[in-house]
Regions:
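Membrane-embedded alpha-helical bundles of multi-pass enzymes
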Residues: 20-224, 274
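Short, Lys/Arg-enriched N-terminal segments with co-localized hydrophobic residues
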Residues: 11-19
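Soluble catalytic regions of membrane-associated enzymes that act on cell-envelope
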Residues: 222-310
Length: 310
């Protein structure tokens, strides 16, 4: 038997809808940061980079006000940085000796600190009507995204363009307009798609897509062809495959250095003119250790090769 009392209360259903409406902008903002993080090398879901501008713009659209758009941008940026740089936890905990909670706190603090720039970009964009927001947001985000290259940040990783490093036809445009130009086109295309699906911003969205598409096409067409110049140089890029556990173990320092020396000597025997050592190839600081720096220089002269570090 079906009784009226078995039906959900209309007030209960209305409360759920209200809660969902309140939560939606914050969930969309978090999804925006996650979408871009998943596009980065590693996860490699490249096309999700196109989604993040629309998700964040929709979050801003659903939460008008003076401060909320900025907070939404900050949430999106924080999620992006926390997911993208999650390696901070094992580095600080497993190898740096910090307690697990302290390592998590370092990651969250760094993500929140870097996410502030996203908050500024979202706040600036929200100051304009939706149609103009499509144009301003990509410019604001990319312009503010340049700041981490300088103090007090000094953090140059995970630019938007790095999501497309495995797309040679896009990477070919970098000599024309750099990672800044490519990153802007990605954000502008994503913002344009968001505008295109909304009735009131359809013209602005279509216009942004056309402009970004033309700019991208011109940059690709203007890309300089690869033309050999000068004498050919044989380059050896060595990869010793040293694990983090080994790098942070002082007892392994000598073995790591000997492995790099051995690979460098083998490359020289095979005719290499230039040998590239990866970042932190050896557990010594050549800038502060004059004795070891002299050893590297002497070894390079002995092998008759140029050694390029980092």
């Amino acid at each position: 038997m079906y009784l009226a009392r078995d039906c959900p209360s209309p007030k209960w259903g209305a409360s759920i809808l209200v809660a969902m409406k309140i939560a939606a902008p914050w969930l969309l903002a978090a999804a925006a940061g996650l979408a871009l993080a998943l596009a980065m090398p590693g996860p490699g879901l490249t096309l999700s980079a196109i989604l993040f501008p629309g998700l964040l713009l929709e979050a801003i659209e659903r939460a008008p006000g003076r401060w909320r758009p900025g907070f939404l941008g900050w949430i999106a940026g924080t999620v992006f940085w926390v997911v993208t740089t999650n390696w901070v936890i094992p580095v600080m905990h497993d190898h740096g000796g910090l307690p697990q909670l302290a390592a998590v706190g370092c990651l969250l603090g760094m993500g929140a600190y870097l996410g502030v720039l996203w908050g500024f970009a979202a706040g600036l964009a929200a100051a304009l009507p939706s149609g103009w927001r499509i144009w301003l947001f990509p410019v604001a985000l990319i312009a503010l995204g340049v700041l981490p290259r300088f103090p007090p940040y000094g953090f140059t990783w995970t630019g938007i363009a790095s999501a497309f490093i495995d797309w040679p036809w896009l990477a070919a445009s970098l000599p024309v307009w750099g990672a800044t130009g490519l990153g802007w086109s990605v954000v502008a295309i994503g913002a344009g798609l968001w505008g295109l699906i909304r009735t009131e911003t359809r013209i602005a969205g279509a216009s942004a897509l056309v402009v970004a598409g033309i700019a991208l096409g011109v940059a690709i067409l203007m890309s300089p062809a690869v033309v050999p110049t000068g004498e050919p140089v044989t380059v050896a890029a060595i990869q010793p495959g040293t694990s983090l556990e080994e790098k942070w173990d002082p007892s392994q320092s000598r073995a790591i250095a000997e492995r790099v020396w051995s690979m460098t000597a083998a490359a020289a025997v095979q005719g290499a003119d230039l040998v590239l050592w990866p970042e932190s190839a050896i557990p010594y600081n050549l800038e502060n250790d004059a004795t070891y720096r002299e050893m590297v220089e002497s070894y390079a002269r002995e092998l008759d090769v140029e050694i390029v570090l980092n």
